[in-house]
Design a protein with these regions (language model features):
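Short helix-initiation/N-cap motifs at beta->coil->alpha
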Residues: 75-84, 103-104, 174-178, 255-267
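Hinge/lid segment of periplasmic solute-binding proteins
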Residues: 103-154, 178, 205
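C-terminal capping/gating helix-and-loop segments adjacent to ligand/active sites or protein-protein/ligand interfaces
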Residues: 138, 147, 223, 360-370, ...
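Extracytoplasmic/periplasmic solute-binding protein
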Residues: 144-147, 154, 178-228
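Glycine-centered hinge/linker elements that transmit conformational signals in sensory
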Residues: 224-256
Length: 438
């Protein structure tokens, strides 16, 4: 069962619009060797991928202005970073700025005294961010995290050329999705690319399906630690729908060997081997980086997740994460902490970062951007994703970030086994209910 501190913010981190307009970015690439942070000097770790250049530019700008107090930077692939930061936090060797997803993990950092209270110290940067996204960085009303990049809804991408070639309607309902799966599968095309090796992309299916079928309150019961919360019929129905997709060949036969870190899931779409991809908005940057002509030629379409006939959830609801966050390590010397806070106020999400994010097709977690997209190469996508977030009646933080680390890992383990056909929904429910008593 989760500690009360992990449920204190924004109704258990199930985020409601208009109280939230916001969105787990994940990077691709290779892992450098990396070392622990020093308490006496500024250091930062972040993710490889499309946004790495923006972070490097920001910290280099700080370094040029502060040559006696420079940041050392290291970048890691998403899955490698999560393992490395867990070890560094536990050993007291975290970098000065701790890259995180808020939610249950940040609450654990707070409970263990691993990060510092930033309340009243980062008002300058919070003043330019979307207020509700800034609130996600709070634990028990105190500010421990500051948004550092873009809002990230989970979006259904599709290869428009393949849809036109096979006369398939972009799916806005579950029945239309299953029809598309059947058509593409019969044509020898993988209907939906899925990075099953990374496992966390599979969460997007159970999150959206549970919300579409049962509404946002279903997961809130699990967040609140209610007995047998995972026995809700909507969760069982969501799992049955996942099995329906797998059995229909929606993900092909090799999804268990596809990695999101390497961008292989997006590559299957832009090379025409797969028709669709359910992934976060950050993957748009991957498409632009790896297949610029594919994007420029209008071959990438995007939709919200399809509605479920008779479902209790609002089809405009969104899942994902509000943004990523910087927290300041409690292990750093006090004067180093103050320098990190100065960076956050003066350089983080400033105009230069905003312009850089917009240029790559990412939406910074900054207020008042509605008129900023006109004339940009990525205007259609930026407007779609920004409106998707702002107009969502409810936005659910990704379950693996909303939950504490132990039940989150159990969730990932059991969900992977569902996709691989190793367990049935009743076994998943039993296993997850057991985490409520742990």
């Amino acid at each position: 069962m989760m500690q009360p501190t992990r449920r204190a913010t924004l109704a258990g981190l199930g985020l409601t619009i208009p109280t939230l307009a916001g969105l787990s970015a994940c990077g691709g690439g290779t892992q450098p060797s990396g070392g622990g942070g020093s308490p006496s000097s500024l250091s930062v770790w972040a993710l490889t991928g499309a946004k790495q250049d923006t972070y490097e530019q920001s910290f280099n700008a700080w370094n040029e202005a502060n040559p006696d107090n420079e940041f050392s930077m290291e970048f890691f692939a998403n899955d490698s970073y999560k393992e490395k930061i867990r070890t560094a936090i536990g050993s007291g060797n975290a970098p000065t700025l701790v890259f995180n997803w808020a939610g249950g993990t940040l609450a654990d950092y707070v409970a263990n005294g691993s990060v510092v209270d930033l309340s009243g110290k980062v008002d300058e940067v919070l003043g330019r961010t979307i207020e509700s996204i800034g609130l996600v960085g709070q634990v028990d009303g105190a500010q421990y995290g500051v948004p550092n990049n873009d809002t990230q809804p989970v979006i259904l991408y599709y290869n428009t050329a393949l849809f036109e070639e096979h006369s398939v309607t972009p799916p806005t309902t579950w029945d239309e999705l299953m029809t598309a799966v059947e058509t593409f599968s019969s044509a020898g095309i993988t209907p939906i690319s899925l990075a099953g090796q990374s496992v966390w992309p599979e969460l997007m299916y159970i999150q959206y399906l549970t919300d579409r079928i049962g509404g946002e309150g279903v997961f809130q019961k699990a967040m609140a630690g209610e007995a047998d919360a995972w026995s809700d019929p909507a969760i069982t129905s969501a799992l049955e729908s996942i099995i329906e997709l797998v059995d229909a060949g929606a993900f092909g036969n090799a999804f268990g060997s596809v990695s999101a870190d390497a961008g292989a899931d997006a590559a299957l779409v832009h090379t025409g081997q797969a028709a669709m991809l359910l992934q976060g908005s950050w993957v748009y940057g991957t498409f632009k980086q790896d297949a610029p002509d594919f994007v420029a030629d209008g071959n990438l379409g995007f939709l919200n997740f399809p509605a479920m006939d008779g479902g209790a959830g609002d089809p405009a609801n969104v899942v994902g994460n509000p943004a990523n966050y910087w927290s300041v390590s409690a292990d750093a010397d006090p004067e180093v902490q103050e320098l990190a806070i100065q960076y956050l106020n003066e350089f983080n999400l400033n105009q230069e970062m905003v312009d850089s994010f917009l240029a790559m097709g990412a939406i910074p977690a900054v207020a008042g951007l509605e008129d900023s997209f006109a004339g940009l190469d990525d205007e259609d996508f930026l407007s779609f994703a920004y409106d998707m977030v702002l107009n969502a009646p409810h936005f659910q933080l990704s379950w693996d970030q909303a939950l504490a680390p132990a039940p989150a890992q159990e969730l990932l383990n059991n969900l992977s086994r569902i996709f691989l056909g190793e367990i049935q929904p009743d076994e998943f429910v039993t296993n997850m209910n057991a985490t409520l008593d742990a």
